[in-house]
Amino acid sequence: MAKNCLTLGELDRERIADIDRRLGLKLDGSPLAATTANRIRIVARASVQSAIDAGAVPADVWPQRSKTRARRKVARTKRSVDVRAFPSPAAMAEAIDAIVTQQPGSKTYRVMTAVAYYAGLRPSEVVMLRVRSTELPAQGWGRLDVTEADISFDEPGEPKTGPRSVPIPPVLVAMLREWIRQNDLTSPDRLLFRTRNDTMPSGSNWARAWHRALESVGQRPIRIYDCRHAAATTWLRAGMPLAETARRLGHSVETLVSTYVGALDDEEHVGNQRVDSILG
């Protein structure tokens, strides 16, 4: 320990900057996933802060976070989606079915897109679903347990906002039951979506297949991630309570309202009607 550790007196800005850089690397020098590196840096910075509070090292030795990056993060949190850009539920269903072509992997991309829309999952969560993640009854609604996400190229981790259980409608239940049967997915640990070479489906190929399908049915291009936004918009306009919508998406209610404010335009009229019914 004495040979390989710095003393508190050696913790100056230059050395801390080098430590901060190295905390973002694996032992072989390749970069860690951003979320993993951030988690490690938080622990390291807390340790240094304890030394600062005790007066053992000068204050503010840790590299300051980029203000530009911080501003970008604030802007992202305040950004709301344009709910008018999303196709109707019927148009979404038509576009999802149109994904299937003669192209390799098109059937996989169809089911993946259906999961993104009908369950409101992030693409990173879709690709990490396993057989054991599914509850698929012969009739009625089912459920997906969202416990993993592809947080980097191929490194699994927890979903962005933690594990959650998401109800799924019968149309998606039937689709997943047929998918599991067709592909003989019997192992509980088996990932639902893999290529013929048993690798992770390509995000770029998925996006291209989706854009071709949208174009073929006369719809404007939207991102795969926008399927999640379209799901939230559909749920809110159907009258799903804010808290339940937020839970299914893995959001706080505050984030939900700020992101999908355009889908809540009808709430004022509905609210007025309910108050009128009470006031007489």
Model regions: which residues?
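Basic/aromatic-enriched alpha-helical hairpins
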Residues: 1-31
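Basic, Lys/Arg- and aromatic-enriched nucleic-acid-binding interface segment
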Residues: 31-34, 38-42, 56-123, 127, ...
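Short, charged phosphate-coordinating catalytic segments
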Residues: 49-61, 116-143, 243
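Conserved tyrosine-mediated DNA breakage-rejoining catalytic core shared by Y-recombinases
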Residues: 64-72, 128-181, 254
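Active-site/catalytic core of tyrosine-dependent DNA strand-transfer enzymes
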Residues: 88-93, 99-100, 148-152, 169-220
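C-terminal catalytic core of tyrosine-transesterase DNA break-rejoin enzymes
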Residues: 114, 118-125, 205, 209-214, ...
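Short, polar N-cap/turn motifs at the start of nucleic acid-interacting alpha helices
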Residues: 133-141, 221, 240-261
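Catalytic-site neighborhood detector that most strongly recognizes the C-terminal catalytic loop/helix
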Residues: 150, 249-274
